[in-house]
Amino acid sequence: MIIRSAEFVISAVQPSQYPDTDLPEIAFAGRSNVGKSSMINLLVNRKNLVKTSSTPGKTRLINFFDINGQLMFVDLPGYGYAKVSRKEQKTWGPMVERYLSSRKTLRGLMLLMDLRREPREDEFLMMQWCAHYDIPWKMVLTKADKFKKTAADRRRHEIARAVGIGADEMILFSTLQKMGRDPALETIARMTGILEE
């Protein structure tokens, strides 16, 4: 799948603000500071399509991006950042679940997790939502450059056991090393039914 164009469309909170489009959508979810913005930027080969921030909890809206005029990437707000106010933490769940439950054009979700961390309640909640709403999902293990290859693979198997899926169903990803871009794009092409070029 070759990405030729990528444009920001809109930021939304409520379903009434979502773009009125029939394009298939792929959502990106994960903890604050896991690397969602960096992953999207690498996939589209643009440095600043999605603004990256060293401040966790910065993305508090649902951001929509038009890719090739063929599909949409949807950047969901990061979860689990303690310094975000309690009120904002409480709005995260309903905002994200509303999107997952109501968006008929949603074709799949990329669930990002830092390879250095253990899966927590929020990751399991996202997996439960995907199962409940029948959304195909793929786990992407970010920051893989922090490990040597064998250690990264060992961590992948440990996390796979913890979440109950096969290690080969996960993508090791590193923005710095440009690792995992092709497998991620292949997954997105499969989920959306867009033929690879």
Curated annotation (Swiss-Prot):
GO terms for biological process? Answer: division septum assembly
Q: Does the keyword Plastid apply?
A: no
A Pfam family it matches: MMR_HSR1
| Gene3D superfamilies reported for this sequence | P-loop containing nucleotide triphosphate hydrolases
Q: Does the keyword Cell division apply?
A: yes
Q: What keywords are assigned to this protein?
A: Cell cycle, Cell division, GTP-binding, Magnesium, Metal-binding, Nucleotide-binding, Septation
Gene Ontology cellular-component terms for this entry are: cytosol
Q: What does the entry list as the binding residues for Mg(2+)?
A: 37, 59
Record-listed GTP binding positions = 30-37, 57-61, 75-78, 142-145, 173-175
Entry cofactors: Mg(2+)
Q: Where is the EngB-type G domain?
A: 22-194
Gene Ontology molecular function terms on file: GTP binding; metal ion binding
Give the highest taxon in the source lineage.
Bacteria
User: According to its UniProt record, which protein family does this protein belong to?
Assistant: Belongs to the TRAFAC class TrmE-Era-EngA-EngB-Septin-like GTPase superfamily. EngB GTPase family.
Role noted for this protein:
Necessary for normal cell division and for the maintenance of normal septation.
Its name, as the record gives it, is: Probable GTP-binding protein EngB
Q: Which organism is it from?
A: Desulfosudis oleivorans (strain DSM 6200 / JCM 39069 / Hxd3)
The coding gene here is engB
